Amino acid sequence: LLDLDACIRCGRCQENCPAYYTGKKLNPKVTVIQAMKKHLDGKAPHLLSGAARPELAMTSDAEANAVSPLEASLLYDVVTPEVLWACTNCRACQEHCPMFIEHLNKIINMRRNLVMWQGDMPAEAQNAFTNLERNYNPWGVGWASRANWLEERGIRNLVNLLPEDHREFEYLLYGGCAVAFDDRYKRAGEALVRLLDRAGINFGYLGNEERCCGDPARRLGNEYLYQTLAAHNIETFKKYGADKIICICPHGYNTIKNEYLQ
């Protein structure tokens, strides 16, 4: 609520939103923060007064057909699904906001309602959820091939692959989905493995026991799926006694460091 009142309408969030500049319906200032504030301002007086149905001063036919503040739903009537699904989660709006308003949390929470309560989501999101549930990565590549990139890049002999090798290690390498299945990121993974080997750092890699960190599921609103993936990874970390983790994937780094603690 304080975020809504804190907005000074400077438009910096709007100016830096990539979705807005590509013609999407999302406008962090207008279609999210100010829309929610207008909804709150219109609804709160009637809730406080206990009025069953507010009397609206109608001045036109369009207004005569308008949904009353008490009947308006935050989702659909105020903030539409099209607006919510246009967000890329880049956080540019928050980075440039002088009032430190947290736009993204509001968008994710509303997505969570759409996904977990309404069952209303784009086909692409549903496909990603299915892939994460079955193969533990957003692309649906077979989970049993998660460690194949080591052989492809010729570095299998440099890696303490768990549980096959299970030698003592100081650090656990968390590769993430992109390193396992995307050709460009495989090269980045290879570079890091060779660097760690050259530096004499003793590390282990989970391979097929590793699963997606869950970040895509949480950002898309499927909190249950995120919790399931996170719980598995945490239990696996504990299983091998990993207390120092090196992340290649930036999403995995942020999720494991900042969100698994929650």
Can you name each region flagged by the protein language model?
Residues 1-25:
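Non-transmembrane accessory domains of multi-pass membrane transporters/channels
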Residues 17, 29, 33-35:
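Carboxylate/His-rich catalytic cores and anion/metal-binding grooves
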